[in-house]
């Protein structure tokens, strides 16, 4: 199959990478796993066993008129332990390499079908100026875009840093969440070739 390159001839690409069927279930599983892996999982609370304090019975069982009480660390007391205390845990989910690659291919194929993948020969700016990048995107009628280059362009990266709906990545830095988060994905010809090699 062929992808249309802006201001140039069409680029011949692999059908298996850019012409796959949309696999919603696979993409969902990989995106959920990716988001789960980003969780810190460091939250922690103390149970009644871990709270500092005496284990002595505050008052005798009967005869005071007050509610019976075993120790001051009871969860129903102020400053007591938490009943079902949260503990640090690893939220990461296993995703096979084949599944991950399949999800990326499926997303790229859907971007092509929806005309959201914009292939350009090169995407460069002369200076790390946000104003310059905004104008370049404006000329292409883009406001919300992920820019993928073969290697990370420092000028582009610095210029896009302060733009809310623009991000710059190299091929190694792409992930399923970023690919579906933007209205358009601008990708260079060299980056397309790299992705094909990476996902082959």
Swiss-Prot record:
Origin superkingdom: Bacteria
Biological process, per Gene Ontology: translation
Keywords associated with the record: Ribonucleoprotein, Ribosomal protein, RNA-binding, rRNA-binding
Region of interest: Disordered: 43-70
GO CC, any one term: ribonucleoprotein complex
GO molecular function (one): rRNA binding
InterPro entries, per database record: Ribosomal_uL4, Ribosomal_uL4-like, Ribosomal_uL4_dom_sf
Protein name: Large ribosomal subunit protein uL4
Source organism (scientific name): Glaesserella parasuis serovar 5 (strain SH0165)
Gene this protein is translated from: rplD
């Amino acid at each position: 199959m062929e992808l249309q390159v802006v201001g140039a001839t069409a680029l011949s690409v692999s059908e298996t990478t850019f012409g796959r069927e949309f696999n919603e279930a696979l993409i969902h599983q990989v995106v959920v796993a990716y988001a789960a892996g980003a969780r810190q999982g460091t939250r922690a609370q103390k149970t009644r066993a871990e709270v500092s304090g005496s284990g002595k019975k505050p008052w005798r069982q009967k005869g005071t008129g007050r509610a019976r009480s075993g120790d001051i660390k009871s969860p129903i007391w102020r400053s007591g332990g938490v009943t079902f205390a949260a503990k640090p845990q690893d939220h990461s989910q296993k995703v096979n390499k084949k599944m991950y690659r399949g999800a990326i291919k499926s997303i790229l194929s859907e971007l092509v079908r929806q005309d959201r993948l914009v292939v350009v020969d090169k995407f460069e700016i002369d200076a790390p100026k946000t104003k310059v990048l905004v104008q370049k995107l404006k000329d292409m009628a883009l406001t919300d875009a992920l820019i993928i280059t073969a290697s990370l362009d420092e000028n582009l990266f610095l210029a896009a840093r302060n733009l809310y709906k623009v991000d710059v990545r190299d091929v190694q830095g792409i992930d399923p969440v970023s690919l579906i988060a933007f209205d358009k994905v601008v990708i260079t010809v060299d980056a397309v070739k790299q992705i094909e090699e990476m996902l082959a």
